[in-house]
Every structure is written in structure tokens, then in C-alpha cells.
């Protein structure tokens, strides 16, 4: 009973979908030899061009997976007038139906038969012609069909009307995976395919070979394309040349680069962002694992005369591109930096906003947007001469730019590195800056340890803001009772003047509460008696002092060296200095020198 129901349902389905007995017979080849059945039905008058509800013809029913086994039935239908160019309701031709099963390696004989019988090889379905449909299944068998299509003058220069507009040459290069792909490329070139065809991005087949074919496999293709006239210095819409396109590849091989350069590729070509190949390479290195092979590429490009310091349209140099985006510090990182510097890269170059490499890296670290490896980069940059006091176009030093992130966990680490290496915390211009650095940090709620560190490295608490407040007045005026004691004492300890009067005529005493007067009076009295309070200031003199702060041959530096000799009990018999300072007592000499340096800014 169940079998009867199945048969009834199938009969109803076939009737509703206009499926004829001939359609069923031609598609039944996998069960038994259906040739005689098909011939009998044709002889009985069944229409070989009948179509079902979806416009699928009898010939299309005969074509399925491995329809080469049904080749005799297909020939029979064609011999009896089956239309080899019929198109179904989905705009698929008979030949398109045949190509749909090429993925499984079938239907090669069927394709040849249809072509020989007049099937339109240039029919377009969904933006593709037949060649574009079967090229991705290239093998020993399918290559014969490609050869057959080309010899029958299929339009090899057709380019898909879709989004990218690639031609068949580009598509084969993009998927190149066996020797038949290379043979097909050569066949297309021999038959005159347009080697200069560009997609919507302006990319050529040569650029595709540089981008998509990994490693040494691309050299034979590149060589072949150049032999047929490919322009080695063409540019896409973004200005990338084939040589620059190599660096879009997942595998960058120096032999490919050398080959292109030897064939005349312009080594200093720039893209639309004014980026050179070296810039692109440096940027690529920042986001991938690199090693000795990349050092060799660096060395080759530099020795070939590539521009070392050419900035892009944002003012970024190759060195900046490498350093700013780097995510890993390994044994080759410093080698790359040194190699660029040795050949003329400027470690203090700035972008269009006046921001130096060191400024950018320091700001990245304190903002928490990068890994810990950037701390190593900061030390390396300073080691090779990065200016710790460089300023941006808005007259801000690195220390000033960092103040926006004083609550970052990395802030104090970076701050100490900069101060230890000579960053001047006292640079201030009332015309451009509202607050001196110390007052600005206090205004932003800087921790006591930050203030102490800056005072230890000689920041001047007596530089006043635009209304005349020094750091002591600022804290006394704005800090609440429960948080200001430790700050005020620290500032007094490091020489903040309690006699400072602001533009409103207010001094420290005006902001001290009545019940605080006795405490601060006693504190000031005790500090004035202590000759040792400035020792922690001078002990923190930067290990590397900028020339614009202290000239090494100046009398001030001689005094500082004299003080160090005193502290280390080295011979300090310098009559000129002792006469100048008016004493030969070691303790008093140290005190006078400390006070002299502290109040000079």
C-alpha cells in the first residue's frame, strides 16, 4: 500500500511540474541502460524540446553528475533536434548546466560534444561566461575543455560584470594551484588576452601575481607576464605598483623583490598616500613575525638606493611606521632600527602635527593601547638619540602630552624614564599653556608619588601659572583639608616659596586656615634649619642632560661636577669655585650648589 501511495504522489508531482516520460527516461541512466527506452519514446512522438515548470528541457534532464556515462543518449537527443542553446527560467543554458558539475570532475566529454554541436560558448550567466565557470576546476581532463573553448574562439577578454571586474587571467592567477593553471595562463597569453586589463581597483594581472601567488612560485608567472608586455611600473587606483604589491602577500620573498628590481621596477615609487615601498614593508613588519630574512630585505632595499626617510602624507617615515605599530620586541627589532638609522633615518622626524616617534610611542604606552614591548622601544629610541624634549606644533613637550593619562598604570614608568634621561619638566610658555606642568598635574589629581618623583628630578615648584600661583598656592587654594597636608609639606620640602604672591595679591598665608597656622609655621621653621633637604634633588640630576639646559663646558656644569666630587670624597681643590661660592667648608659648599641649581630654571 505504501509503495502505491509513493507512486501516486510521484505521478501527481510529475504532472504538476510538467515532467514528461521522456524526461524521466533520459535521467534514469544510473539505474539501467536507458538508450533503447529513450529511442522508443522519441519514435512514439515525445517532444525532445519539452520543458518542465521551471523551463528545464529534456536535454538538461539528460545532463547531470557524470553525464558522460549518458553521452549516447545526449547524442541521440541532439540528433533528433534537441536545442543545445535552450535557456531555462533561471537563465541557465544547456552548457551552463553541464559546467555546474565540473567541480566533481565530470562532464568533460559532454562539454566538447555540446561545443561541437553549436552550443553558444559566449553565453553569459550571472556575469560569468563558460570559461570563468570551469577555470577553477583545472585538471588534466578539464584543461582539454579549456583548450577546446579557446580554440573555438571563446571571448577570453570578457571580464565579469560584477563587483571586481576580473578577467579570466586574473582569476586563474588568483587561484593558481597546479601545473595546468600555468599552462592555461600561457595559452591565454598566446591567444592574445589583454594583459593590461584592470579591475575596478586598477589592479593588473601582474599585481595579482605579486599579491596572491606565494613565495618563489610567483617568479615564473611574473616572468611570463613580463615577456608578454606587462607594465612593471603600472599603478592601481591607490598608487600601488607591482613591486609594492609584493608586500600585500602573506609570504614576502627576497628573490621576488630582487627579480622585479632587476627587471626595472621603480624602487622609490610612491602610492597615493605618498608611501614608498620601504614604508609599506616597515608597516607590514609591525604586524607579523619577522627575522633574519626580513633583515636581508631591508639591507637589499637600502643598498639599492631606496629613500630612507621619505614621509607619507601624514608625515610618517618608514622608521615611524615600523616603530609605532610594532606589537613584538625581539632580537631583530633593534637591528631594524639601527639599520635604518645607519643609512640616514632621522630618529627625531615628526609628523604633520609635529609629533615625534618618541612622543607617539610614549603616549601609546601610557594610554594603555599597546603591549609592554613598547617600554623597550622607548629605551631603544632614547639610546639612539631621540629628543626627550621635542615639541609638537602646539608647543607641547612629551611630558605635557603624557599628562592626560596620569592615572595610567604605565604613566609613572614612562615618566621616570624620560626624566632620568633629561626631559625638562620646567618648559612653560604662558602664551601657549594655561598651567605649568607641575600645577597641571596637581590640577588633574596627580598622586603624591608622581609629584615627588618630578620634584626629585628638579621640577620647579615656583613657576607660576597665568594668574600668578605657584604650586604651593595652587594646592593651598584648591585642595581640601584632608588631602593637602602631605602635598603642601612635600612642596615646602622641595623649596616651594611660601612668599609667592599671585595677581590677586594672595599668598600662602591667605589660604591657610587658622587652625593650620601653627603646623605650617613649625614645618617651615624646621625645613629652614635642615641643610640636607636638597640632597634628594641634586642626587636626581638626570643622567643625560640636554645641552639647552646645561652646556657641558659651562661654569654651572663645573660647579655640579665639583659637587659630585665633594659627595664622593674626590679631590675638590678648585680655588676658583670656592672663591666664587665664598667658603671652603664641604657641607656649606654642597648646600650652596644645591640651592643654586634648584632655583635656576
Curated annotation (Swiss-Prot):
Keyword Transcription regulation assigned: no
Stretches forming ANK repeats: 17-50, 54-86, 91-123, 165-197, 201-234, 238-269, 274-310, 314-349, 361-390, 397-427, 432-463, 467-500
Alphabetical keyword list: ANK repeat, Repeat
InterPro entries xrefs: Ankyrin_rpt, Ankyrin_rpt-contain_sf, Multifunctional_regulatory
Record-linked PROSITE patterns: ANK_REP_REGION, ANK_REPEAT
Keyword Magnesium found: no
Protein name: Putative ankyrin repeat protein R841
